[in-house]
């Protein structure tokens, strides 16, 4: 994997970025002037980071695995020690699909109904492969989301969730906290 150098990261034009960043040259970054990256972050091949005007912040010690899309028009905040597995899509904005309006970016704004709400991912969260996270979701500290899940609602801390749509499966151990 080929990663950007510190000089190349400066030229991308991030609002702010920390140290020890491993960002693949095969990732795509849109509107970097509104993206804040902390320390010790790895972003793998074929990821998309697309910021709007709302907060788009990745704190420290975060891994964004290959093929993850972060659509941040409504804002995305990912707190420290969180990880997102391959193929997951995180949407802070979406059209409404209830049939009361038209959908898609090629339709005039007045004919659309947009849902725009920030995604908050607290510390120690892990999201499995190929999940979809919808606008307005807050994943509280320590949440784990199983692979192929539809995350259409917020999740209480230290729970393991899965399914489409998600449901609480069981409590998650907090033993990992003793490792820090």
What are these regions (language model features)?
Residues 1-36, 40:
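Extended, small-residue-rich solenoid/repeat segments and analogous flexible loops
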Residues 27-37, 42-135, 164, 170-173:
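Flexible, glycine/small-residue-enriched loop-and-beta-strand segment within the central core
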Residues 63, 126, 144, 150, ...:
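Short-chain dehydrogenase/reductase
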Residues 67, 141, 157:
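Short active-site oxyanion
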Residues 88, 95-96, 138, 149-150, ...:
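Flexible glycine-rich beta->alpha loop in the catalytic core of nucleotide-sugar glycosyltransferases
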Residues 120, 130-143, 149-152:
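Beta-rich strand-turn-strand
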């Amino acid at each position: 994997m080929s990663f950007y150098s510190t000089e190349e990261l400066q030229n991308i034009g991030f609002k702010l970025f920390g140290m020890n960043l491993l960002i693949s040259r095969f990732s795509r970054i849109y509107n970097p002037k509104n993206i804040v990256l902390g320390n010790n972050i790895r972003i793998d091949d074929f990821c998309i980071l697309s910021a709007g005007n709302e907060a788009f912040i990745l704190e420290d010690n975060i891994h964004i695995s290959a093929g993850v899309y972060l659509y941040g028009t409504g804002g995305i905040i990912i707190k420290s020690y969180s990880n997102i597995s391959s193929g997951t899509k995180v949407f802070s904005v979406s059209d409404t699909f209830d049939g009361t309006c038209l959908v898609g970016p090629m339709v005039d704004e007045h004919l659309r109904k947009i849902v725009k709400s920030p995604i908050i991912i607290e510390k120690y969260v892990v999201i499995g492969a190929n999940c979809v996270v919808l606008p307005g979701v807050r994943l509280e500290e320590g949440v784990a989301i199983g692979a192929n899940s539809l995350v259409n609602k917020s999740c209480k801390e230290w729970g393991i969730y899965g399914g489409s749509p998600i449901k609480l499966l069981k409590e998650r151990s907090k033993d990992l906290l003793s490792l820090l």
